[in-house]
Amino acid sequence: MLPKMQPSAQCLIVFSLAFVLGWYVLRPGNTSCVLLITGESVRLVNCELTKDLVEAVLLRPLKHL
């Protein structure tokens, strides 16, 4: 069984894990592109602004439903 940990240590572990996962997803060498859709907006996250992407957005802008 695992020993009990202090709440501050648990908090540090959780924030460290979130930071590492966030860094992995948003690192410069990552080629994935994420479309984040919320009730307020539509965002492209971690995408390179290539000429093709800019032309696609200009030709067919994203609309709210």
Swiss-Prot record:
Q: Which family is annotated?
A: Belongs to the Tymovirales TGBp3 protein family.
- Function, in words: Plays a role in viral cell-to-cell propagation, by facilitating genome transport to neighboring plant cells through plasmosdesmata. May induce the formation of granular vesicles derived from the Endoplasmic reticulum, which align on actin filaments.
Q: What else is known?
A: TGBp1, TGBp2 and TGBp3 seem to act together for cell-to-cell propagation. TGBp1 is the main movement protein that physically cross the plasmodesma with the viral genome. TGBp2 and TGBp3 would facilitate TGBp1 function.
> Could you identify this protein by its name?
Movement protein TGBp3
Q: Which Pfam families match?
A: TGBp3 (PF02495)
Predominant location:
host cell
One record GO biological process: transport of virus in host, cell to cell
